[in-house]
């Protein structure tokens, strides 16, 4: 379990193409990405988010951001010619408690490309990866900086031990509408399907 927070967050709604508008709360895929930033072993394990608790009231703010109005391609982009100011509707002062379980992939079920650089031992078990995560999360270690929707909005985090007394989540019930759960990269890595 992790408690994550930050000054700003933007979990962009895909149906709004031009201006960035955030979902009301963190998406499950963004929550999974925070766990993966701390520990990611592509062929050995994956994270499955089981519960997201909202700890701070949902507050909105708008800002204008400079963005590049062109797709990166083979030719270089002169940023000064392609710069655009766009409005963003963001979340302010967010705090979440995210619960996830580690799904271990047994050695026999891993694809052949998993063994190109590293030959795992046959006695690998999920506890090895759970302890790696626990150690890394409690010491503030990560492979990449976790973020809250957009890389500009860095996430602070704290590992929550099972013995800690937890503050109750926000006592509010609200319809969040349709929300992207995650992307399925199993079938096609180039064009994943929405889940």
Q: What is each of the regions a protein language model found here?
A:
Residues 5-8, 47, 60, 157:
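A residue-identity detector for tryptophan
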